[in-house]
Amino acid sequence: MAVYTDIAEDDLKWFLTEYDVGTLLSYKGIAEGVENSNFLLHTSKAPLILTLYEKRVEKSDLPFFLGLMQHLSARGLSCPLPLPRRDGALLGSLSGRPAALISFLEGMWLRKPEAKHCREVGRALAEMHVAGEGFELKRPNALSLDGWRGLWEKSEARADEVESGLQGEIRNELDFLAAAWPKSLPSGVIHADLFPDNVFFLGDELSGLIDFYFACNDLLAYDVSICLNAWCFEKDGAYNITKGMAMLEGYQSVRPLSGEEIAALPLLARGSALRFFLTRLYDWLMTPEGAMVTKKDPLEYLHKLRFHRQIGSAAEYGLSL
């Protein structure tokens, strides 16, 4: 979450008259994340999250995101729920941006996740994949192979400012993945961004998943690889196989991976590491000065990409074959 667009209190109060949420008591911006402008609101009825959708988010995608949260919640997944306006619409407008009110989810994200938490995340990810079955709206993954190349073209000229020699290395990686990427693995709705700050816990119990604004239709095992990258490396860059084993066991307790998915996991992990390297690289180079947003180091994901190149089997991630 982040803040790119400021809001005036009077405009916010007028916006809230379209909802049955009581009167505004206080509000503040939330700096974490990189995509939309987010605010924590306290009203006389309940705390809420206000999201203003910025230019990177296509307005035509918003029915998918908001509808998906409704669909998953109705099937028992703990996640935020968009609040309807008095006219029944889920989307309004504030400060020149499409805007929505979202229910507040209790919990905190973990700064130092342990293996037991990774097991819960794996289980919750599989539960989301199963709950997503039957969701009728479709959204292609804008940050898959074609999207990676487009991002790279915007950043390539300045890439060596981050590390010398990056241009040739990333060009070669893109070409390799384009030729080797699997096409026929099981697919469905994926979260595509299930990092620790998008998973809330109350104590050691997972209380819910948030931030579905990268969700799309893609390979389910690709979503697993994103979580391995996001949860199972230590601050020094080392892969923690105990966390990986726990996450994969948790996932497979709900939805067992097929043999083809298991064989493809190292390749998928290379792809997901490259995806987050490229978006971080773009944001690192292009984010405007003064934006209330937390930029993230792209080199973290370059090191993960290089790690996955050395992996010969999913067993090296902790998967029991």
Curated annotation (Swiss-Prot):
| Pfam families for the chain | APH
Give the domain of life: Bacteria
Q: What is its EC number?
A: 2.7.1.39
Record keywords:
Amino-acid biosynthesis, ATP-binding, Kinase, Nucleotide-binding, Threonine biosynthesis, Transferase
User: Which InterPro entries has this protein been placed in?
Assistant: Aminoglycoside_PTrfase, Homoserine_kinase_II, Kinase-like_dom_sf, Pseudomonas-type_ThrB
Q: What pathway or pathways are given for this protein in its record?
A: Amino-acid biosynthesis; L-threonine biosynthesis; L-threonine from L-aspartate: step 4/5
What is catalyzed by this enzyme?
A: L-homoserine + ATP = O-phospho-L-homoserine + ADP + H(+)
Q: Name one GO biological process term.
A: threonine biosynthetic process
Q: Example GO molecular function term? A: homoserine kinase activity
Gene3D superfamilies annotated for this entry? 3.90.1200.10, Phosphorylase Kinase, domain 1 (3.30.200.20)
Alphabetized PANTHER family for the sequence:
AMINOGLYCOSIDE PHOSPHOTRANSFERASE DOMAIN-CONTAINING PROTEIN, AMINOGLYCOSIDE PHOSPHOTRANSFERASE DOMAIN-CONTAINING PROTEIN-RELATED
Tell me its family. Belongs to the pseudomonas-type ThrB family.
Name the record gives this protein: Homoserine kinase
